[in-house]
């Protein structure tokens, strides 16, 4: 049986893609009052705006209301996946080759359960990571969680694009 998160993913993924968004993550939290948290990114690599979140939220809300997956009242939160976005699909590692990532493992690899390094390659269900001047090969199914890391270079790039968008 599918989890509620997987059922929601199956319902909204294609529609969000048609709207130009990648569905990054679906989480359902809370016991007495449910919160459905949806993280999105834009397929064109532009920044997710408040308008994007509103548009996606309205669409998702309509779909969830029609399908009636969640019987009790819930809050819907749609937001950007952020600069330190989670990597939840193998394809994410391919997309972010050259970027720094923090990876937590399900079990030890070379005596470690965490790695932070640069993604060199992602192929054959393996992630190749440059870590402390070494190459580490991590089987995808060994990864518990992973997030991009905000580096100084990325921060400067973000500041540069903010300054450009704020000038008229």
From Swiss-Prot:
Its main location: cytoplasm. GO terms for biological process: ribosomal small subunit assembly; translation. InterPro entries: Ribosome_maturation_RimP (IPR003728), RimP_C (IPR028998), RimP_C_sf (IPR036847), RimP_N (IPR028989), RimP_N_sf (IPR035956). Keywords: Cytoplasm, Ribosome biogenesis. It is found in: Cytoplasm. GO terms for cellular component: cytosol. Required for maturation of 30S ribosomal subunits. Belongs to the RimP family. This is Ribosome maturation factor RimP. It comes from Rickettsia bellii (strain OSU 85-389).
């Amino acid at each position: 049986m599918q989890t509620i998160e997987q059922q929601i993913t199956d319902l909204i993924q294609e529609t969000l893609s048609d709207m130009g968004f990648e569905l990054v993550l679906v989480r359902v939290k809370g016991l007495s009052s449910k919160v459905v948290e949806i993280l999105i990114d834009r397929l064109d690599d532009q920044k997710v705006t408040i308008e994007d979140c509103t548009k996606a939220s309205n669409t998702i809300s309509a779909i969830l209301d029609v399908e009636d997956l969640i019987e009790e009242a819930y809050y819907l939160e749609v937001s950007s996946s952020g600069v330190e976005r989670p990597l939840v699909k193998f394809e994410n590692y391919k997309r972010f080759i050259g970027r720094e990532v923090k990876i937590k493992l399900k079990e030890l690899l070379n005596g470690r359960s965490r790695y932070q390094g640069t993604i060199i390659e992602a192929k054959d269900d393996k992630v190749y990571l440059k870590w402390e001047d070494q190459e580490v090969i991590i089987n995808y199914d060994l990864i518990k969680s992973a997030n991009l890391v905000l580096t100084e270079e990325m921060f400067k790039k973000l500041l540069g694009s903010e300054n450009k968008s704020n000038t008229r």
